Amino acid sequence: MAPKISISLNPPYNGEFYSSNDQMSGIVSLQLTKALSIRKISVILKGFSETLTKIDQEYMFQQNGMMMPGQDNKSFHTLMKFEQRVFPPDNVWNALDGSSKPFKVKPGSYNYSFQFEKFPRKPECLKNHTAKTVAFVTRNNARLPPTFNSHWQEFNKIDNLDLYFYSFGKVIYMVQVQIELGKSSSWFKPFHKLIREIETFEFIPEPKDLIVEPDEDDNEELNAFSNNSRGNSLVTNNEFFNSSNLKVPSKDVKVVNGVGYIKSDRNFSQANSILIENGDIRSRPVSSVTSTRQSTRLVNGMKVFPSTYKMGLPDGESNMRIEVRSRDLKQIYRKDYLFRSGSQNFDKVYVVMEGNIASLSKMQITPLKLQLNLLETTTYLSQGIANGNYSSLKLIEIDLNQLKSNKPLLDLNEIRENFDGSMFECELRLKDHPILRKLVFNEEDYRHRGNRLYSFKTCTIKRIFSLQLLIEWGINGIRKQSEVNIDPVQIFCQVREHVEAEALPRYVPPPTYTEMAS
């Protein structure tokens, strides 16, 4: 009967997943029912990333003018690998002086403890990167990535093409026990036999090592070559799925410190927008999204995120747009308030109007519905070929008029003009809505396709998020919709650390003394 091996890992410090400050440790249990010749037992801590990208026949035909079979491109990167021998002990191993003679281990149960150093900050594969290695990161901003798609085998069992392609990129960490048996006495089995057992675990670095560096040349218009294999979009379970396959042009690859990396992968990682039309969520054509790229500006120290388009008003001359103003909307942690006053997220939303103030003051403008979506763009890269996967998570959908309040969310009596009188603005007080002001981000620690919600970028995998705020308006009985995109937003699955001031010690009055009579 074969030996029985089990691996028991000590729990992480936070009780949920291993992080940068953890030291992987545990116990290896070995049960033998009969004597076994063992040369050594090793514990290996390792991590790797793997991507598979595809080019379909239609794209190959456009490039070569002939039908050719679809091409698969694979990439494999070793992120870390550490080995520790637990049997025999160091003093015995050193005394062997290179001898390969095995030990005869009697039947019974044996336990071996192990402990590794803290996780490294940078991946090991960087030493193998060259100028011909096309990657999403440089040597300077490369960090050890989090676990991603560790349950990829389950995707292959589901009859869903989107999940199937989503599983083509993965980051896996594991502890592996390797038992090297003694050499067989038979001449036809001249090699040492290996017995292996693995235990995967979830690793997510500290937030400072998850931050996705902004792409260079962000304002430069890049022309990626599409193979026109963008599939039909569909909506299931409040999720929007899409995918695309593109070839990274050589002009978009820059060499830094001897490593080629993509200056900006904006074109093949731009998610489709979601529209509400007659009560249904529908996808907007790609052309209308890319042609309305937003630009942010600063007002009173706050970033301004304008709506993607202006809405014409009934008088035919005026228009309005929505602006989200925030100091810290580019990073969102789990359990952060989204609309609450002081959250610095969606607590300052303004309606900005252009036109005649007399005409504007007569209009009936009312917010009717609100929907907030989290858009995910996951891009896999292999040998210069990039495949994009897109999805959308609905964070909230609410009828703004369902709960009546004494004060309306938008009061045009509070409208004010700017310094030159060309524009007018009025605050949309979403922070006063009784439901929205209690809404926190990802309170339940949701797993999307088996993964927690976090942004990251590594050599061949990039996962970024953006937020999409949709508001349906009633303007003099006509329904219109505004859309604001915050792209990208750094998402963390950790809870934000709040630094609390140390409380002052309680005042204790000094003791009183009385003079004793002599």
UniProtKB/Swiss-Prot annotation:
Keywords: Cytoplasm, Endocytosis, Isopeptide bond, Ubl conjugation. It comes from the Eukaryota. CDD domains: ART10-like (cd22952). The keyword Ubl conjugation applies. One of its GO terms (biological process) is endocytosis. It is found in: Cytoplasm. GO terms for cellular component: cytoplasm. Ubiquitinated by RSP5. There is a cross-link at residue 118 (Glycyl lysine isopeptide (Lys-Gly) (interchain with G-Cter in ubiquitin)). Belongs to the ART10 family. Interacts with RSP5. May regulate endocytosis by recruiting RSP5 ubiquitin ligase activity to specific plasma membrane proteins in response to extracellular stimuli. This is Arrestin-related trafficking adapter 10.
